[in-house]
């Protein structure tokens, strides 16, 4: 994995929103009418976690207020600051995470068990959005394979499907089709079983030493560091192992723009922008945007390239 230097620190900057995407669906007037907020839930309100701290990474972390204040979570609005504003009162306790489908041992975890069922550890990962911006985040969680091993997938299990909470009373983007970016909720994502079992794939319950803020996907979210951020589904309530591949949310909304695999790939551009480079959030100053080359698989090529042996990644994007 390529090491980042002190020049790769990623404080926040104001840059392009996914309004280009929204315009494609005729929602630009609504999107531009939405306010932009820059404040997030106070970190002091969040539960401190016990976890094994990372001692190996040399990546330079994104400042905490940038990670919690610049988010895509359309259930709470399409502007980057909207999730931090509209998710302030989002209730994550009680919570229920159901694991089922093609498994021998279906089970359910409650809120407290999300933090105690498996030992927690810190993983410092690059985070790459499909919008061509990047951060470095100190996630806290457990490997998804630990949860799957407990569930005991059957021989029919080929895919792992994730569902976000559906609660329009708490999530205004689910209640208002336009406010939520035109998405048909609940949000659905999926991985192949091999991807889900990989040791880099994380179920995160926290960052920066504390439980996740609502805008970051509390109380539990997926983190797949070699894929674009929309694959790392937030506020998960159901995990189902399936024999067949589902149609995921962005794949359903714009299949020519968002594929199932969504691996970070500098050689495969989005139809409306290049993926060859990425903006480092906040670096470069007010009048200058810092860009850096995009790394294949977001810098995790050595660890995950074997998962796609024989697969044409230009077609299977």
Swiss-Prot record:
The keyword Iron is assigned to this record: no
Keywords on record: Metal-binding, Molybdenum, Oxidoreductase, Periplasm, Signal
Alphabetized Pfam families for the sequence: Oxidored_molyb
UniProt EC number: 1.8.5.-
UniProt key word Metal-binding: yes
InterPro entries assigned to the protein according to its UniProt record, in alphabetical order: MsrP (IPR022867), OxRdtase_Mopterin-bd_dom (IPR000572), OxRdtase_Mopterin-bd_sf (IPR036374)
Cofactor(s) for this UniProt protein: Mo-molybdopterin
Location of this chain's protein in the cell: Periplasm
Entries under Gene3D superfamilies matching the protein: Oxidoreductase, molybdopterin-binding domain
A GO molecular function held by the record: oxidoreductase activity, acting on a sulfur group of donors, quinone or similar compound as acceptor
GO cellular component entries: periplasmic space
Annotated binding of Mo-molybdopterin, by residue: 71, 74-75, 129, 164, 216, 221, 232-234
GO biological process, one term: protein repair
Chief localization: periplasm
Catalytic activity: L-methionyl-[protein] + a quinone + H2O = L-methionyl-(S)-S-oxide-[protein] + a quinol; L-methionyl-[protein] + a quinone + H2O = L-methionyl-(R)-S-oxide-[protein] + a quinol
Residues spanning the signal sequence: 1-40
Free-text remark on how the cofactor is bound: Binds 1 Mo-molybdopterin (Mo-MPT) cofactor per subunit.
Post-translational note: Predicted to be exported by the Tat system. The position of the signal peptide cleavage has not been experimentally proven.
Similarity annotation: Belongs to the MsrP family.
Subunit structure: Heterodimer of a catalytic subunit (MsrP) and a heme-binding subunit (MsrQ).
Role summary: Part of the MsrPQ system that repairs oxidized periplasmic proteins containing methionine sulfoxide residues (Met-O), using respiratory chain electrons. Thus protects these proteins from oxidative-stress damage caused by reactive species of oxygen and chlorine generated by the host defense mechanisms. MsrPQ is essential for the maintenance of envelope integrity under bleach stress, rescuing a wide series of structurally unrelated periplasmic proteins from methionine oxidation.
Classification via NCBIfam families: PRK05363.1
Record-given protein name: Protein-methionine-sulfoxide reductase catalytic subunit MsrP
UniProt source species: Histophilus somni (strain 2336) (Haemophilus somnus)
């Amino acid at each position: 994995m390529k090491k980042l230097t002190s020049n790769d620190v990623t404080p926040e900057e104001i840059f392009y929103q996914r309004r280009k995407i929204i315009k494609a669906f005729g929602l630009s007037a609504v999107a531009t009418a939405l306010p932009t907020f820059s404040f997030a839930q106070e970190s002091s309100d969040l539960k401190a976690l016990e976890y094994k701290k990372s001692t190996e990474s040399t990546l330079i972390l994104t400042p905490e207020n940038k990670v919690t204040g610049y988010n895509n979570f359309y259930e709470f609005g399409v502007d980057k600051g909207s999730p931090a504003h509209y998710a302030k009162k989002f209730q994550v306790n009680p919570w229920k995470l159901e694991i089922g489908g093609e498994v021998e041992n279906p089970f359910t975890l409650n809120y407290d068990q999300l933090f105690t069922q498996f030992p927690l550890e810190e993983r410092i990962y690059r985070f790459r959005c499909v919008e061509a911006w990047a951060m470095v985040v100190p996630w806290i969680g457990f490997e998804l394979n630990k949860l799957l091993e407990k569930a005991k997938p059957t021989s029919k299990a080929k895919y792992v499907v994730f569902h976000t909470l559906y609660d329009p009373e708490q999530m205004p983007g689910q209640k208002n089709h336009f406010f939520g970016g035109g998405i048909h909720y609940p949000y659905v994502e999926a991985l192949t079983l091999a991807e889900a079992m990989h040791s880099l794939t994380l179920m995160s319950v926290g960052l920066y030493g504390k439980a996740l803020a609502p805008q970051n996907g509390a109380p539990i979210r997926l983190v797949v560091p070699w894929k674009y951020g929309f694959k790392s589904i937030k506020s998960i309530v159901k995990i189902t192992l399936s024999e067949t591949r589902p149609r995921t949310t962005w794949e359903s909304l714009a299949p020519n723009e968002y594929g199932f695999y969504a691996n970070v790939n500098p050689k495969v551009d989005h139809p409306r922008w290049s993926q060859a480079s990425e903006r480092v959030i906040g670096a470069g100053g007010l009048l200058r945007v810092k860009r850096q080359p995009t790394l294949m698989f977001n810098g995790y090529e050595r660890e995950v390239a074997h998962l796609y042996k024989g697969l044409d990644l230009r077609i299977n994007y």
